[in-house]
């Protein structure tokens, strides 16, 4: 595995990614970070965002991450995510519906708890939608 990293993205439901990659860029809670083979070991919390990686052929691929943790070792990155979806698996129609529901909940302003949940739902929907739309524009997976 010279020059490559094993990337594993796992949720409570399934293994989303388990493959050898060249690089990983993740949405850390303290800022985005990149990993190459031989990286110093560390743990990081992840925020909602896009995890990008370059596969063995050099193709850039992306995964939606809804928070979690990343363990980085010299030749392996393990992401434990609350939820995750490959860009190619995101359903743009479902994203649009989730976006509309979140916007309606924000406009209703029923109570503070619902308002905060609606803000988080809106951020998730916007990130997923952005990723789904970028798939169409750039052909990436």
From Swiss-Prot:
Keywords: ATP synthesis, Cell inner membrane, Cell membrane, CF(1), Hydrogen ion transport, Ion transport, Membrane, Transport
GO CC annotations on file: plasma membrane; proton-transporting ATP synthase complex
InterPro entries, alphabetized: ATP_F1_dsu/esu_C_sf (IPR036794), ATP_synth_F1_dsu/esu (IPR001469), ATP_synth_F1_dsu/esu_N (IPR020546), ATP_synth_F1_esu_C (IPR020547), ATPsynth_dsu/esu_N (IPR036771)
Primary site of residence: membrane
Chain segments annotated as transmembrane: none
Subcellular location: Cell inner membrane
Superkingdom, taxonomy of origin: Bacteria
Membrane topology: Peripheral membrane protein
One family name in Pfam for this protein: ATP-synt_DE
SUPFAM superfamilies listed in its UniProt record: Epsilon subunit of F1F0-ATP synthase C-terminal domain, Epsilon subunit of F1F0-ATP synthase N-terminal domain
Example of a GO MF term: proton-transporting ATP synthase activity, rotational mechanism
Summary of subunit composition and partner proteins: F-type ATPases have 2 components, CF(1) - the catalytic core - and CF(0) - the membrane proton channel. CF(1) has five subunits: alpha(3), beta(3), gamma(1), delta(1), epsilon(1). CF(0) has three main subunits: a, b and c.
Similarity remark: Belongs to the ATPase epsilon chain family.
Protein task: Produces ATP from ADP in the presence of a proton gradient across the membrane.
Protein name: ATP synthase epsilon chain
Organism this protein belongs to: Desulfatibacillum aliphaticivorans
Gene coding for it: atpC
């Amino acid at each position: 595995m010279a020059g490559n990293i094993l990337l594993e993205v796992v949720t409570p439901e399934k293994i989303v990614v388990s493959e050898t990659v060249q690089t990983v860029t993740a949405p850390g809670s303290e800022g985005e970070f990149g990993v190459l083979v031989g990286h110093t070991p560390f743990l990081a919390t992840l925020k909602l965002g896009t995890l990008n990686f370059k596969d063995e052929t050099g193709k850039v691929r992306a995964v939606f991450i809804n928070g979690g943790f990343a363990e980085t070792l010299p030749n392996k990155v393990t992401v434990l995510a609350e939820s995750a979806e490959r860009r190619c698996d995101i359903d743009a129609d479902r994203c649009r519906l989730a976006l509309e529901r979140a916007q309606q909940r924000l406009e209703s302003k029923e109570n503070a708890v619902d308002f905060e949940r609606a803000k988080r739902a809106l951020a998730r929907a916007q990130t997923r939608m952005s990723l789904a739309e970028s798939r169409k524009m750039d052909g990436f997976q």
